[in-house]
UniProtKB/Swiss-Prot annotation:
Pfam families: LMF1 (PF06762), LMF1_C (PF25179). Residues 1-39 are annotated as: Disordered. GO terms for cellular component: endoplasmic reticulum membrane. This is Lipase maturation factor 1. Belongs to the lipase maturation factor family. Keywords: Chaperone, Endoplasmic reticulum, Membrane, Transmembrane, Transmembrane helix. It is a multi-pass membrane protein. The keyword Hydrolase does not apply.
């Protein structure tokens, strides 16, 4: 896949345009009795969404937890004080662009609470934001309890990271999480942490906001394919996908060797799920549930077949809005104190009430808020719908600074061969010497050593590994951070080395030279000669990616970019 067309990973521009849709709040239709899927004596009604809200909030909290865990583990080395692209330097550049001001213009360009914090220790700020996010998301995940305050905090914290993360946070799933999280704010009651807040039933507007989101995600992904690479029309894209996806897993190794007819079936199934199934949302309860089941199964298959970060896990979240309490009852235990019993009591009270329940001021305010949300989402959806209908459709783009409603798409084109950048170092005084021994650095997950088994890490992901995949399609001049990484490896920088799996110079003097080599990779044939030798990959050198460099060669390069020159260990002399 080309990096500029990969939907879930395509980097967005520095100036982001941002956008979603909505629906009007309306009272639930007269509920009908349905046999509880858990086969308990209680009969849960259709048409209510108390349990749906709990499942949605827990699922969203899980994604937030993974996202903040990735941030806590990787941000310091990527955007910290001495990171590959320091966020302090980025914010200073934004400030200078707006004549040294941190006013409204700077806030709307890069909405982040970093503007309010002390920049003298950005590593502390980054860890603080990540730990707060981990703490709040853990609470919601474990308890199923949330209110608007907690969900707003999660959304604001993650948005603060995304808007200073630069290219490391330019993947499509960042905007998708922010849009999903924004809807999650209005899914919750304002103050109470009750899992079943009787005065705050789940809003139909918010539910339709989630349904509108999954509709756009899937239809956008389907349309970008049929408008993009012709292999989606001649049904051959899956012949290449498993081998050339950003970070393959072991299952992809075997799926790649599936019969040709199976790959054709996969492609046709993809078109069915992405182009036709989304319209099931508008065909009543049964078809909506069928839509939810098909979309979740589709995402599970994608999760099994590749390390696509938490993208597919995240896409499951809005699909949950297709199910009501009767459909999700099987997820909850039965019992006199169980949630199903409590929901049944609420349903009975509603059905037995002769007069409509009087609404207090809080309920009326909440209804106004929900209607306002629907109007906002509908308004922001206008350019998104225009984009969907356009023959020049773009994906993973936002039309507003808060990324409330966005465009989506995936794999608009598929690359037909896999290339990788391999970083190598040597302690030889002369990089051109025939006897110079070059040793490979190994990344956490991206292909490198042909004998190393592909990793299995979804929903976790390594941002550096993903960017290395993009770098292989471009030049090092287009990816200045890769030379920053090379400089840090030359100095034996511990933060940079923590981003890698294997440092060939561990316990030794750092290398004198670093170079980048460009290789073509192919899966070995299961049962073939290379596979029997233990190789998962066959690789062939294409040529140099960047020439051999010493730390002193990078001094001017670092100076012009205001990067501090890494200091080699005192025991190391050159």
């Amino acid at each position: 896949m080309r990096p500029d067309s990969l939907v879930m990973a395509a980097p967005e521009g520095s100036l982001r345009k941002r956008k979603v849709g909505g629906a009007e709040h309306s009272p639930a239709s007269q509920p009908s009795l349905a046999r509880d899927p858990a086969d308990s004596p209680a009969r849960l009604h259709t048409g209510t969404f108390w349990l749906t809200r709990i499942v949605l909030l827990r699922a969203l909290a899980f994604i937030y937890f993974v996202a903040f865990l990735v941030a806590f583990n990787q941000n310091k080395a990527l955007i910290g004080d001495r990171g590959l692209l320091p966020c302090k330097l980025y914010l200073k550049n934004v400030q200078e662009y707006f004549q040294g001001s941190t006013g409204w213009a700077a806030w709307t360009y890069a909405p982040t609470i970093m503007w309010l914090l002390d920049w003298s220790d950005m590593n502390f700020n980054l860890d603080l934001i990540a730990l707060l996010g981990l703490g709040i998301s853990s609470f919601v995940l474990v308890t199923g309890c949330a209110n608007m305050i907690l969900m707003t905090a999660l959304w604001a914290l993650y948005m603060s990271l995304v808007n200073v993360g630069q290219i490391w946070y330019s993947f499509g799933w960042e905007s998708q999480l922010l849009e999903t999280g924004f809807l999650g704010i209005f899914l919750s009651p304002l103050w109470t942490l009750s899992r079943l807040p009787k005065n705050t039933p789940t809003s139909q507007i918010v539910l339709w906001g989630f349904r509108w989101l999954i509709f756009r995600i899937m239809l956008g992904a389907g349309l970008i394919k049929v408008r993009g690479d012709k292999c989606w029309l001649d049904l051959t894209c899956m012949d290449f996908h498993y081998e050339t996806q950003p970070v393959p897993n072991p299952i992809a190794y075997y799926l790649h060797r599936s019969p040709w007819w199976f790959h054709r079936f996969e492609t046709l199934s993809n078109h069915f799920v992405e182009l036709l199934v989304p319209f099931f949302l508008f065909l009543g309860r049964r078809m909506r549930i069928l839509h939810g089941v098909l979309q979740i199964l589709f995402q599970v298959i994608l999760i099994i077949s590749g390390n696509l970060s938490f993208l597919n896990w995240l896409t499951i979240v809005p699909s949950l809005a297709c199910f009501d309490d009767a459909a999700l009852g099987f997820l909850f235990p039965s019992g006199p104190q169980g949630l199903k019993k409590q929901v049944l009591e609420i349903q009975r009270e509603d059905t037995q009430r002769v007069q409509p329940k009087p609404r207090d001021r809080g309920c009326l305010v909440r209804q106004v808020v929900n209607i306002s949300l629907g109007i906002l989402v509908a308004w922001l959806s206008v350019p998104v719908v225009i984009n969907l209908l356009s023959s020049r459709q773009i994906m993973n783009t936002s039309f507003n600074p808060l990324r409330i409603v966005n465009t989506y798409g995936a794999f608009g084109s598929v690359t037909k061969e896999r290339t990788e950048v391999i970083l190598q170092g040597t302690v030889s005084p002369n990089a051109s010497a025939p006897d110079a021994v070059w040793e490979d650095y190994e990344f956490k997950c991206k292909p490198g050593d042909p004998w190393r088994q592909p990793c299995l890490i979804s929903p976790y992901h390594y941002r550096l590994d993903w960017l290395m995949w993009f770098a292989a399609f471009q030049t090092y001049e287009q990816n200045e951070w890769i030379l920053h990484l090379a400089g840090k490896l030359l100095a034996g920088d511990s933060e940079a080395l923590a981003l890698l799996a294997v440092n060939p110079f561990e316990g030794r003097t750092p290398p004198r030279w670093i170079r980048g080599e460009h290789y073509r990779y192919k899966f070995s044939l299961p049962g073939g000669q290379h596979a029997t030798q233990g190789k998962w990959w066959i690789r062939k050198r294409i040529g140099p990616y960047f020439p051999p460099l010493r730390l002193e060669d990078l001094k001017e390069y670092f100076k012009t970019r205001e990067w501090p020159l890494p200091e080699p260990p005192s025991r190391h002399t050159r």
